[in-house]
Amino acid sequence: MCYAIPGKIEAIAEKTVVVEYFGEKRKAYNELDDLSVGDYVYAQGGFVIQKIPQDEAESILSVWKETFFDLQEVDLKLSRLDLNQESVSKECLRILDNAAEGRKLSREDILVLIKEKNKSALELLFKVANFLRQKHHKNSCCVHGIIEISNYCCADCAYCGISRSNKNVTRYRMSQKEILEAARQAIEEHGFKTLLLQSGEDSGYSIEELAEIVRQIKANWPALIFISFGEVGLDNLELLYTAGARGLLLRFETSNPKLYKQATGGKDLSSRIAHLKKAYALGYLIITGSLIGLPGQSEEDLLNDIFLAKELHAEMYSFGPFISHPQTPFTGNPSASTETMLKVIALARIIDSAHAKILVTTALETINPDARREALLAGANSVMLNATPLKYRPLYNLYPLRAHEKESIEVQIKDTIGLLMSLGRSPTDLSV
Ligand code: SAM
């Protein structure tokens, strides 16, 4: 199975190319040397990542053609919207009607939605978000792979199971050879077109080593590489970009500077924000968001989190529930509920309808095994599958009982594709 559909180059203007998919045209940034009009390519996240032979492309397209339009039909049916709901308050209906029509909501309106408790109103909120997702992004759903390369961390976050203060963690650091082999398998054998490398803030790798790993992956296999190594330093972001990294996953964790300090052992939020701003200026695709349910977090904070992610030019929003880890200072605090998580996802979709890719996080699936389906029907359109070697997965113990921890990548792919097909989604990155 492949997570991208080949597109045909229709026009080239310097580094910008127009790619055509079954009649739809998208723009992408090209970094390949030998591209001509008429060539077939894979594009991800707005970047051309690989040229493919015409016969190969045409055979993949002929398989996709019917399925592609059939899936769109199913998605369209599932995202129909009916705003005639008697059990929903007039105020809520007014706000949701404005949202569905694409009119900008005031802060007060969004707060009303975030405080809403009525089940029918919430169902309608999720439907509006799903309607907007379909309207702007059609049925595409990104399926990215993640490799967790090390669980060493010099940070001391009060929520995180792999923080430096947790002495009960068995630490691991994958060697360059292991990382390259895991990347090869993910790209070559399992078809991932975008791969995220993640670790704690681990000074055990020099920045040159990390850059070399990115360089080697780029030199050997066609994929878009995202990194998530924490705060690597502003200059090092540039080094990693030059090596070939094109996406940065860095959550700001909370938009509330006081809460951030409490949650991170005294760190300053401004440093994370500076990384995110610099990364955007360098050309990275930004994946960011926050932890929902941190002790002391208010509903206003949640709203500010969504606005901050937007302000930071999130290409993809990543909001996950805080889950209490027994060996951390935040142990015993309750997790955010699925309902709160779905509200945040739906509101992110409403606030940034046309642009946002919204991730269903593993943490959300951990608190609710059906959450992937529920979130995809509440505005989300992106999933990340765990391609870390099985032997290391239990050691990347951010919180207990992580979803999919014991599932092989083959099983994750099969289940994901099954779910996406049942919802009429195509596992593609078309909405570039
Ligand atoms: N070191 C990198 C960083 O700082 O962004 C990436 C690794 S960090 C462990 C990845 C994410 O895990 C964090 O951004 C945080 O939101 C999430 N996380 C850590 N502990 C968690 C917990 N107890 N519950 C839910 N998510 C958690």
Predicted regions and their residues:
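Short, charged beta-turn/beta-strand-edge "cap" motif at the junction between a beta-strand
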Residues: 45-51
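N-terminal pre-triad scaffold of radical SAM enzymes
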Residues: 126-165, 171-198
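Conserved strand-turn element in the central/C-terminal portion of the radical SAM core barrel
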Residues: 195, 200-204, 275-300, 319-336, ...
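A residue-level detector for short acidic-glycine micro-motifs
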Residues: 8-13, 32-34
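Auxiliary Fe-S-binding modules of radical SAM enzymes
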Residues: 4-5, 16-27, 35-36, 61, ...
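Core AdoMet radical
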Residues: 164-180, 186-208, 213-276, 285-292, ...
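Catalytic cores of alpha/beta
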Residues: 233-240, 295-308, 366-377
